[in-house]
């Protein structure tokens, strides 16, 4: 029934202007305004997400968006240089940069978390 659908994700923010600045300028993503006061964030491969304003927004307590990168150190260093702080979580062995290092492909990728201005985990 939905196998040919181009699914997309969405999440809320408490301030659409802050979201536009963060996703567009801080992260350098392709952000487009939607006539419904919704942000569309477009990615390579014709995929996108939407970010919508919500007055009673509550930050997600789980990762809402993941960015696979070839060089996690370079990505984290670049984010830190733009003022982004890496999150630290109890129960994870994180290095001085806040990266959880994977030792093998079976363990999955190395991971670092940060939040957007609305507190959503990325």
Regions found by a protein language model. Give the residues of each.
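N-terminal beta-strand motif that seeds the catalytic metal site of vicinal oxygen chelate
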Residues: 1-20, 48, 62-65
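Conserved short beta-strand elements that form part of the metal-binding/catalytic scaffold
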Residues: 29-70, 87-88, 107, 121-122
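Vicinal oxygen chelate
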Residues: 1-2, 67, 76-122
């Amino acid at each position: 029934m939905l196998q040919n659908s181009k699914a997309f994700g969405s999440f809320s923010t408490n301030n659409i202007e802050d979201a536009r600045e963060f996703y567009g300028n801080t992260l350098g993503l392709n952000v487009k305004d939607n006539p419904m006061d919704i942000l569309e964030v477009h990615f390579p491969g014709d995929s996108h997400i939407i970010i919508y304003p919500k007055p009673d927004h509550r930050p997600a307590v789980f990762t809402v968006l993941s960015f696979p990168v070839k060089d996690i150190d370079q990505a984290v260093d670049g984010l830190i240089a733009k003022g982004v702080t890496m999150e630290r979580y109890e129960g994870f062995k994180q290095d001085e940069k806040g990266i959880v290092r994977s030792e093998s492909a079976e363990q999955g990728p190395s991971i670092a978390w940060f939040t957007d201005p609305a507190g959503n985990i990325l």
